[in-house]
Amino acid sequence: MSYNLDVDEADVAVLNQNLIRSKELFESIGKSLHKISTKSQTASSTINPVLKQVNQLTTNKHEVENGLKLLQEVSENASKINDLENLLNNSIENSPGGIKSYLINLNQSKNLLSQIKTQSKFKQFKGILYNFENLIDRSETKVQKYYQDLINGKDSRAIIDKRDEIKLIFQYFSNPQTKSTSNSGGNEEYVTKLYVRARSKRLIEKLKPIESSTKPAVKANANIPYEKGTNGITKYTDVLSGEIEQELIILNECQLSTHLIGPIVEESISRYNGIINKYNQVYFKTPQEIVDNVILILEVLNNLIDFKVKLKQIGLNRTLEQSNFINTFEQYLETNSVIFKEFIQAIDNRFQNLGKFNEINTQEVIVELMSKLRRLSEFKLALLQLIKNYSIGQWLVSQPPMRFVNVFSSVIPNSQPQANSDGEEDEVIQEYLLSSFYSDVIDAIMINIEIGLKKNTSGGDSLPSSSSTSASTNATSGTSSLSLNKKSTQGFILIKNLFMLESIVNRSQYLYQSLGSLGEERILRLKNRFLKLFLDDWSHASYIIIRDMTTIATQSAQHQQSQQQSSNTIGTGGGTVTNLSNKEKDQVKDLFKNFNESFEEALFNYQKYNFGDAILKKYLSNEIKKLILNTYFKLYDKYGNSDFTKNKSKYVKYDKLNFEKLLNERL
């Protein structure tokens, strides 16, 4: 039978069947998944412990590897430390490459130590670090000792020869990266202190043996003058300034700071200041001590000036200030500027104690005093410094006043130089003051002699004649002697002494230059003053002519006027007169008679003088001729051939030619 099946029903049936199959399939899958899940859980519980072990093993492996790496680094650094230790334990002298190589190794050691200390992983190796640090400290101490050996007690040449090593050591310690690992020093400040201390000590030791020679020697005889250079102050100053200059050269050669020179020389200059101060505080306290030691005082000052100039030349002005030298210098000037007053006062005192004045003892005193002045003048720079605060003539002020001051001064008015604007005023004024002082000294000597000679009486005081056979003949002996009470004799002694004094000046380069043209002019004023005294006899003879001729001429003129005569008789001028009155004839006779007596006495006295110097004799001879020749010629021209007498030869002993010839022969 055929069944008619509905199509939709067929589809539903098919779908149901498929659903049933799908359900079965899903159930089967679910079971399988459950099995898988169960098995996975079982596997997981089994694998987890294994994974933990694997991870632990991996961690352990990394730790082992890191440990091995650390050990390797430590081993490498330990090897480096060992190598450096071997190098640093060597002496610097035996180190290959010397100090340069040693400092390189030391610098490397410091860098390595610094590098290791910054890494925390090395902190556990404290023993290595401690030993390495001690090694570096010992090595730096070794460098410092080597450095001290280089600079201690060595002269400049030895230091300069080692300048490269000194520079390297300074560079090492001045490098911030090489700062000392210890607290005991080793930086730039420390090595600088070592250098300053070593060089300062050497300088002091160099000077110490000379210091005792700077003390003024005790004189066995107070009259023996101090000899320039016998005191050790010049040597001391030369050594000090020379060594300071060498220390500066060393600093420059070693490329060290020149500012170190101050601390190096400070104590030595301080000792020098002490020596200088001691002169015035201990040795030259009284005026007499100052006068007795004036050459030494000036020698010391000359050295102070030289020292000051030398240090300024090498740029150490600041050192001079800081060492208190400038104060010492100025104090020395202030204290010893009294030498000008004391020197002239000593001259005045010397003549007051001379007793009777004569040719010989005055010459002796002049030689004595001018020798002192000549030696004084050799210290021109010192004198210019000492005199700079004086005003003209201030050294002559004293209480009571010195004797010669109120008698005569050769000072030339308005001779002081004018101020200028070229910066040389002080120097010019100082030169003028020094020249004036020297001239005042000469005034003091010569005017004191003049005062002393004028105080002498004729009794027993006489002048030896030129016929004296012995230079040592006493000035008061001899029958053919002249009274020292005569002006002409006093004038002769004064001029002769002045000539001798002038010859001493001319032989002294410094004294002659300092006196200059102004000093020469002042000596000339003294010479003219004394020449007037010397020419007193000749002036009297000349005066007789001038006086009597004037009298005769005046009376004749009056007579002519009253008698209204022609002017064939004239006064003191014109040609030969005639028609003389009896009175005039007698007056002319007396004139010739008085002149002849005065002239012959002057000539007689002149021939008794002991000139001893041809230049002096020629000078005086010329001055006499200038005074007497023209005067006599006027007399002869007026009355020599007149009719005043029949016995002409009795009165007119010389014509003009014979008169001049006589003077040339006898003067």
UniProtKB/Swiss-Prot annotation:
Keyword 4Fe-4S: no
InterPro entries xref list: Cullin_repeat-like_dom_sf, Exo70_C
One annotated GO molecular function: phosphatidylinositol-4,5-bisphosphate binding
Region (Disordered): 460-483, 557-579
Localization terms from the record: Bud; Bud neck
Coiled coil ranges: none
Cellular component per GO, a single term: cellular bud neck
Gene Ontology process terms (BP): exocytosis; protein transport
Membrane in keyword set: no
Biased composition annotated in UniProt, kind: Low complexity: 557-570
Keywords from the UniProt entry: Exocytosis, Protein transport, Transport
Family that this chain belongs to: Belongs to the EXO70 family.
Function per UniProt: Involved in the secretory pathway as part of the exocyst complex which tethers secretory vesicles to the sites of exocytosis. Also plays a role in the assembly of the exocyst.
Protein name (Swiss-Prot/TrEMBL): Exocyst complex protein EXO70
